[in-house]
Amino acid sequence: MANHKSALKRIRANRAKYLRNRYQMKTTRTFVKRLRASTVKADANELYKKVSGMLDKLAKRNIIHKNNAANKKSKLAKFVNKLAA
């Protein structure tokens, strides 16, 4: 166990950040699953806009790497474009 006051504070802060990051990742994953499950192009386009923003936000906050976000957005865009109108 940590002995210093600052170390104890870091433990608390890291735990809070971990929980926040986990929540944001889980929410994004859920929306990605919804997007992949959609069959109507109009709905998929709306969801894609939302998911794209979520991925960008995760990358901006260093929760995921920016290239990881770009790859996911690219694959999702391909998926949406393949859907029949």
From Swiss-Prot:
Q: Which GO terms describe its biological process?
A: translation
Identify the keywords attached in UniProt to this record, alphabetized: Ribonucleoprotein, Ribosomal protein, RNA-binding, rRNA-binding
The organism's superkingdom is given as: Bacteria
Matching SUPFAM superfamilies, A to Z?
Answer: Ribosomal protein S20
Q: Name one GO molecular function term.
A: small ribosomal subunit rRNA binding
InterPro entries according to UniProt: Ribosomal_bS20, Ribosomal_bS20_sf
Pfam families, per the entry: Ribosomal_S20p
Q: Which GO terms describe its cellular component?
A: cytosol; small ribosomal subunit
What is this protein for, i.e. what is its function? Answer: Binds directly to 16S ribosomal RNA.
| Similarity field | Belongs to the bacterial ribosomal protein bS20 family.
Q: Which protein is depicted?
A: Small ribosomal subunit protein bS20
Source organism per entry reads Cytophaga hutchinsonii (strain ATCC 33406 / DSM 1761 / CIP 103989 / NBRC 15051 / NCIMB 9469 / D465)
Give the gene symbol.
Answer: rpsT
